[in-house]
């Protein structure tokens, strides 16, 4: 703000008063091309900030990009629980419907002895069915067979509509199993939970990342306009 002591909203207004629109720049990376802080991993925060400033155009670069991993975790089971712990259900790998290259492998180091492989690089998916007592937010726990000390990516699709993206950090240790949690929303009664990694190339990764920023910008501008009773800026 040293260059714009009145703040960014005032700058936008000054530019608008000249009959012009103001845009801003960031990068789909950890840093911009000038090695300044960028938006990858901070999409929601940056979108909210740009909406509050009143920014009307946006240029999104590709410097210092970190691609989404093509590798998916191996799944031993999933469990679903509500927030107060009064409900929990565990669904083993054997109860999933498998598609594409997804398959069950045996492993004596796991309590269940089995896990799902083949979910990486858009090659396969696993579909679980789960019944819950009421609408609401639930904790989805992924029981993971730990292999490969690397980041892994998974998309969780609930009832064929709502998508939750999650990155599983590198896992190592003496035990063969691990856990990773995702908050999801379910409806009372029957639900489906599909697991897959749709990233099969760097192009796929970029498309998913750019789409995420686009969604956050549209959400942020709509929410800001609704809160302040103003026209929604593009």
Regions found by a protein language model. Give the residues of each.
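Conserved beta-strand edge residues that scaffold enzyme active sites
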Residues: 28-30, 64, 146, 170
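A cross-domain feature marking catalytic cores of carbohydrate-active enzymes
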Residues: 24-28, 62, 197
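Aromatic- and glycine-enriched glycan-recognition loops and surfaces
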Residues: 1-27, 40-44
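Beta-sheet entry/capping signal
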Residues: 21-23, 192, 232-234
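Active-site neighborhood of glycoside hydrolase catalytic domains
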Residues: 17, 39-71, 86, 205-234
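Extracytoplasmic
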Residues: 72-219
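Short, solvent-exposed loop/turn and secondary-structure capping segments
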Residues: 25-27, 33-38, 69-71, 153, ...
């Amino acid at each position: 703000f040293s260059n714009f002591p009145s703040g960014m909203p005032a700058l936008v207004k000054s530019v608008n008063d000249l009959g012009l629109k103001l845009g801003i720049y960031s990068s789909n990376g950890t840093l911009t091309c000038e090695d300044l802080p960028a938006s990858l991993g901070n999409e929601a925060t940056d979108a909210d900030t740009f909406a509050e400033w009143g920014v009307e155009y946006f240029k999104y670069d590709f410097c210092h990009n970190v691609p989404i991993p093509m590798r998916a975790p191996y799944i031993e089971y999933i469990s679903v629980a509500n927030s107060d712990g009064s409900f929990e259900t565990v669904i083993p790998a054997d109860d999933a419907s498998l598609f594409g290259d997804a398959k069950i492998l045996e492993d004596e180091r796991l309590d269940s002895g089995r896990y799902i492989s083949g979910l990486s690089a858009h090659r396969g998916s696993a579909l679980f069915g789960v019944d819950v007592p009421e609408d609401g937010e639930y904790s989805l726990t992924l029981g993971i067979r730990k292999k490969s000390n690397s980041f892994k990516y998974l998309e969780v699709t609930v009832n064929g509509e709502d998508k939750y993206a999650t990155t599983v950090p590198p896992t190592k240790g003496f035990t063969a199993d691990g856990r990773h949690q995702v908050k999801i929303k379910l409806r009372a009664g029957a639900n489906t939970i599909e697991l897959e990694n749709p990233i099969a190339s760097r192009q796929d990764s970029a498309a998913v990342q750019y789409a995420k920023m686009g969604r956050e910008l549209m959400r942020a501008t709509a929410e800001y306009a609704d809160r302040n009773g103003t026209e929604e800026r593009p």
